[in-house]
């Protein structure tokens, strides 16, 4: 067999990962219910481990098909790009719901909140302290990931590795600052609708930063092991798009919730 096929598409081989991933998601869901109602975390941890293992194995297969088997033709890459764009659009609407909840409560505070915003008794964080530093850190990481992209397209391998490493470190630094800010916050998620919307919106953004940092760490490892070329590096492009999306969401969070909302 020559491996010839009369079309440019990649027809994937039968894979166990969709079935395993669905089972893992079900296990995690049941585990969350067990944690909420019975304070038992064993099933939830099992579900998390199964999901992480499935993600690693599945993406390992995708990397092998793209890098070592050459299955990702220009047509396949076009589909992947459109899929990533649609995924980011879905994430935009995900965060739109949190902003809607925040403005629904803040633009017309109810009597229960003291007809004021922030609610009576809630002392918001200083927008010009740690949040401003976090803004500078995340915007700087956006610059360094763009630097890495240009270095990669120009074939400057060492420069791409260095700038990617700086981006990852800035992402981890942001996460550390966010965790410290949560620890020092004078209110909790249970303190009125302000605490709920604040921690849910910024918490999910923090989760996206962790996911994006992990994505970029994988890209850094792949760059070290010569997986990318100047013309074939969609994995990194997707990570860069995702990271810029995280940057933009943070700017809206900072302006709306930290600055205007306080």
From Swiss-Prot:
Gene3D superfamilies in UniProt: 1.10.287.70, Cytochrome c oxidase, subunit III, four-helix bundle
TM spans (from-to): 11-31, 32-52, 83-103, 125-147, 160-180, 198-218, 240-260
Subcellular location: Mitochondrion inner membrane
Impact when changing residue 52 to I: In strain: Bf-M01 and Bf-H10
GO biological process, one term: mitochondrial electron transport, cytochrome c to oxygen
GO cellular component, one term: mitochondrial inner membrane
GO MF assignments: cytochrome-c oxidase activity
InterPro entries: Cyt_c/ubiquinol_Oxase_su3, Cyt_c_oxase_su3_dom, Cyt_c_oxidase-like_su3, Cyt_c_oxidase_su3-like_sf, Cyt_c_oxidase_su3_a-hlx
Annotated EC: 7.1.1.9
Membrane topology: Multi-pass membrane protein
Chief location: mitochondrion
Substrates-to-products reaction catalysed: 4 Fe(II)-[cytochrome c] + O2 + 8 H(+)(in) = 4 Fe(III)-[cytochrome c] + 2 H2O + 4 H(+)(out)
Alphabetical UniProt keywords: Membrane, Mitochondrion, Mitochondrion inner membrane, Translocase, Transmembrane, Transmembrane helix
Coiled coil regions in record: none
Enzyme class: translocase
Similarity comment: Belongs to the cytochrome c oxidase subunit 3 family.
Role played: Component of the cytochrome c oxidase, the last enzyme in the mitochondrial electron transport chain which drives oxidative phosphorylation. The respiratory chain contains 3 multisubunit complexes succinate dehydrogenase (complex II, CII), ubiquinol-cytochrome c oxidoreductase (cytochrome b-c1 complex, complex III, CIII) and cytochrome c oxidase (complex IV, CIV), that cooperate to transfer electrons derived from NADH and succinate to molecular oxygen, creating an electrochemical gradient over the inner membrane that drives transmembrane transport and the ATP synthase.
Assembly: Component of the cytochrome c oxidase (complex IV, CIV), a multisubunit enzyme composed of a catalytic core of 3 subunits and several supernumerary subunits. The complex exists as a monomer or a dimer and forms supercomplexes (SCs) in the inner mitochondrial membrane with ubiquinol-cytochrome c oxidoreductase (cytochrome b-c1 complex, complex III, CIII).
Protein's name in the database: Cytochrome c oxidase subunit 3
The species this protein was found in: Branchiostoma floridae (Florida lancelet)
